[in-house]
Amino acid sequence: MKKENMAMLCDFYEFTMSNGYFKNGFYKKNVYFDVFFRKVPDNGGFAIMAGLEQAIEYIRELHFEDEDIEYLKSKGIFDEQFLEYLRNFKFSGDVYAIPEGTPIFPNEPVMTIKAPAIEAQLVETFLLLTINHQTLIATKANRIVRAAQGRAVLEFGSRRAQGANAAVDGARAAYIGGCKGTACTLTDELYGVPAGGTMAHSWVQMFNSEYDAFKTYCEMYPDNPTLLVDTYNTLKSGVPNAINAVSYTH
């Protein structure tokens, strides 16, 4: 998966404030910015920290391309010396964070950025969107896993995710929250989250009978057949046909 430069994925006021810091001599001043949240959704007791790996990768790779500088220059409001500063930008600060998968609580810092003012300001948007999204997914997944009381829970969220990155990162976050695996193949390829799944209704409908569909699938994947039993009638045909197909092939 090709990595994109996310430097410009940033609220515009981060640039206008940073320009002001530069012109007023604040850009070398070290500051501390904390990432925290105020309330756990749905009256939950705690959240599950997630998104740290992507946040750190972003900080390490953060730089501005020539076209980014030209875009900012075209706005006509940024100091030339500030734009030159951005051209040579590299994060030099320190990051302190709670490890992924750790329970976290309202109003406590889950990440602290110690850096020169401009550096701390420019990373704000990406850090918040990354930690907020993945922590939300990990927290919800953890609640479901705990409610399942030891039964395996899988993540199948890609087709309803808000974009490709949300699908991949959301599956990773669900795994951090306790899910056993995901339907998202790319998340397995990139992060090693076990990919798996059942079958689609289209597979069952491709055959002359539900039993034939199950039997063929069991023959192809005898070690771990997972059958979808609700295409026609779950109790009258799906479950009986699944039992018969598994019994026949085993």
Q: Model-found features: residue ranges?
A:
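N-terminal, Lys/Arg-enriched amphipathic/low-complexity engagement segments
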Residues: 32-87
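Buried, small/hydrophobic-residue-enriched core segments of structured protein domains
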Residues: 1-32, 39-41, 77, 83-92, ...
